[in-house]
Regions:
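Extracytoplasmic small-molecule ligand-binding "clamshell" domains
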Residues: 6-82, 155, 245
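Extended ligand-binding regions for polar small-molecule ligands
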Residues: 42-52, 112, 119, 123-132, ...
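Periplasmic-binding protein-like
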Residues: 22-24, 100-108, 188-230, 249-255
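Bilobed "Venus flytrap"/periplasmic-binding protein-like clamshell domains
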Residues: 23-27, 37-50, 105-160, 178-182
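Short helices/loops that flank or line small-molecule/ion binding pockets
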Residues: 50-54, 60, 65-79, 92, ...
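Ligand-binding clefts/hinges and TM-proximal coupling segments of bilobed small-molecule sensing domains
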Residues: 55-58, 133-155, 192, 227-255
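Gram-positive cell-envelope targeting signals
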Residues: 1-12, 16-19, 59, 78, ...
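Acidic, polar ligand-binding/catalytic clefts
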Residues: 46, 58-120, 193, 199-206
């Protein structure tokens, strides 16, 4: 299909909103058994659009980099990828009202060296996605501490692959958020262990610990409508109800 503009309309006369996702961050957003995007981020956004009858929401699964470039080109109107906030991205995109809170963990092989800080990881190998906040944090550490650099392998593989590589020893560690860790461990029970990332170091990953939907700069009106709906969903307890269905020990801003 051709690129959608914000004015494209469906047969029903509704404005079609295309939401793009990398769909590889379970339990937040992933491809479900029916080959459609599923997870907390998707359930929340669907609940938002239930309150916005003038719009028809469509999802497109693509790689992480294409989510961002597609927002810039106007192909997509919303990015759905459990986005954290950072200044660079904040200058390029509009952010929604936060709908979730995140905490990050270092993941290492069970029984091996525990990593409790970036300092502990000096000289070790890390695997992560290109352009995602945890990889950016490792890059920032390396720039500031060239004598304690961490070896980075970039991959667009699913997070489960990163955990498998840590478990089999081909990578020393990865960094993911706690809810994802719990979700993958419940499903696969990898031979790995976790340590919480200290709060001061977590700020290297994200300037705050919330998750957001992102929009192109020209979608201020859509962002306002989404924000209004998100606040209503928080106040009426819907966000908490959706989070209870997820496999995690998490805190949602609805809770």
């Amino acid at each position: 299909s051709g690129s959608a503009s914000k004015d494209s309309s469906s047969d029903s006369g509704k404005t079609v909103i295309k939401a793009a996702t990398g769909a590889n961050a379970k339990p937040y957003v992933y491809v479900g058994d029916d080959d459609k995007p599923a997870g907390y981020d998707v359930d929340v956004l669907n609940a938002v659009f239930d309150k916005l009858p003038d719009y028809e929401l469509e999802y497109e699964v693509t790689d992480f980099g294409s989510v961002l470039s597609g927002l810039n080109s106007g192909n997509y109107q919303i990015g759905v990828n459990n986005f954290s906030y950072n200044e660079d991205r904040g200058a390029s995109y509009l952010y929604s009202y936060p709908y979730d809170k995140i905490s990050y963990v270092f993941v290492t092989k069970k029984g091996g060296k525990e990593i409790k800080s970036f300092e502990d990881a000096a000289g070790l190998s890390f695997e992560g996605g290109t352009g995602i906040s945890v990889s950016n944090a490792v890059e920032a550490w390396n720039e500031k501490n060239p004598d304690k650099a961490i070896n980075i392998t970039y991959s667009d593989a699913d997070t489960s692959v990163f955990l498998q590589h840590v478990a089999d020893g081909s990578q020393d560690f990865t960094i993911i958020d706690l809810a994802m860790y719990n979700s993958y461990m419940e499903e696969f029970n990898y031979d790995v262990q976790k340590n919480d990332i200290p709060e001061d170091e977590a700020k290297m990953i994200a300037e705050n610990s919330y998750a957001y939907y992102i929009f192109p700069q020209d979608q201020k009106d859509l962002r306002e409508q989404v924000d209004k709906a998100l606040k209503e969903l928080k106040e009426d307890g819907t966000l908490t109800e959706i989070s209870k269905k997820m496999v995690w020990s998490g805190y949602c801003t609805g809770g």
